[in-house]
Each structure stands twice: as C-alpha cells, then as structure tokens.
C-alpha cells in the first residue's frame, strides 16, 4: 500500500448532507473511508468491463431438482469449465427446490458466459451472478 495523501473535495451542501447520512447508515467512521470504498467500487466495476481480466464472483441458482435431467445438465455444463469453478455448495431448500452456489474465478468473459449458460438452462427458476475483484490491484 502506498502512502496516504490528503486532498480536498468541493461539494454542494445538500449533496454533502446526503453523503453524511449515507456514511452514518453504513457505519463509516470517517468520510475518507466512505470515499475510499466508492473509489474502489468504481475501479472494480471498471475491471468487470475488461473481458480478459481475471475476476471473481459467485453464481447462485435456484431450481427444482425433480425437473427431468436438469441437475445432470447443470453438472455437465460445470464440468465443461471446471477450471473457473473454485468450489460449489448445494443446499436442499425443500423437497423440490435446490440452491446451488458456485464460487468462480477466471477471465471476465468466461465467467459471464458460464453464468449465462447456467442461468438460461431450461428449468432454472432464478440465477444471479455477483462479481467482485481478485483484489490484486487494490490497496
């Protein structure tokens, strides 16, 4: 981590008031911590746009495992790209519905493509990809 540099920011008073409320709601002790997080989030979002850059994330899927061969099809897709799946968790929500959570890491485009393949598989009730950074370029 580099040295800390102090700099000034000019804001409209109403915008600052709203920012202070946000800081309080999210339990930031200082405005500086909140601003650092905003900058980091912007940098991470920029990473996601780079299709070749390595990213990490989770993919959650909810599906009825009684649907004909759905679990088998999902497993086959996962085996096709096992190198970007770090781990998976399978939870039985009730007699019919399962929650599957995949932890992913790999080139951005490959991660997004896998997520789309799984989410769009017939029988998947809901799917959500949540992306983050590998942290390598953040301080």
From Swiss-Prot:
* Its job: Transcriptional regulator.
By sequence similarity, the record places it as follows:
Belongs to the transcriptional regulatory CopG/NikR family.
Highest taxon of the lineage: Bacteria
Q: Which PANTHER family match?
A: NICKEL-RESPONSIVE REGULATOR
Q: Which GO terms describe its molecular function?
A: DNA binding; DNA-binding transcription factor activity; nickel cation binding
Q: What cofactors does this protein use?
A: Ni(2+)
Annotated protein name in UniProt: Putative nickel-responsive regulator
What the record notes about the co-factor is: Binds 1 nickel ion per subunit.
A Pfam match: NikR_C
| Entry annotated with the keyword Cell membrane | no
The residues listed in the UniProt record as binding Ni(2+), with positions renumbered to this chain, are 79, 90, 92, 98
- State any GO BP term from the record: response to nickel cation
What does UniProt list as this organism's lineage?
Bacteria, Pseudomonadati, Thermodesulfobacteriota, Desulfovibrionia, Desulfovibrionales
**UniProtKB keywords:** DNA-binding, Metal-binding, Nickel, Transcription, Transcription regulation
């Amino acid at each position: 981590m580099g040295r800390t540099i102090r700099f000034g920011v000019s804001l409209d008073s109403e915008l600052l008031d709203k920012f202070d409320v946000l800081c309080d709601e999210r339990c930031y002790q200082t405005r500086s911590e909140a601003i650092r997080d905003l900058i980091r989030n912007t940098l991470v979002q920029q990473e996601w746009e780079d299709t070749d850059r390595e990213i990490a994330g989770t993919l959650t899927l909810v599906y009825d495992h009684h649907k004909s061969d759905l679990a088998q099809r999902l497993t086959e897709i996962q085996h096709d790209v096992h190198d970007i799946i770090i781990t998976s968790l399978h939870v039985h929500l009730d007699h019919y519905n399962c929650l599957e959570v995949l932890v992913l890491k790999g080139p951005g485009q490959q991660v997004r493509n896998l997520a789309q393949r799984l989410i769009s598989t017939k029988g998947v009730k809901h799917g959500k990809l949540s992306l983050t950074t590998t942290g390598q370029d953040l301080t």
